[in-house]
From Swiss-Prot:
InterPro entries: MORN (IPR003409), MORN_repeat_protein (IPR052849). Coiled coil: none annotated. The gene is Morn2. Might have a role in spermatogenesis. Transmembrane segments: none annotated. Keywords: Cytoplasmic vesicle, Differentiation, Nucleus, Repeat, Spermatogenesis. GO terms for biological process: cell differentiation; spermatogenesis. This is MORN repeat-containing protein 2.
Amino acid sequence: MNGFGRLEHFSGAVYEGQFKDNMFHGLGTYTFPTGAKYTGNFNENRVEGEGEYTDTQGLQWCGNFHFTAAPGLKLKLYM
């Protein structure tokens, strides 16, 4: 698949965004079965670059993501 699409996994996880060669690639949103979600850049099925993670409590964390590491994430505060 290439272009924009939606993939629903039997676990309840959902990816909606850009695909390239059947992989998550470009901008997209991955929603975990728990309700947490990541919105941002993907590169060959991996989170890579600028993005935002919303945890199960609704707290939003933004910054640079590099596969399994996300050094320097910042918590977004709304005042």
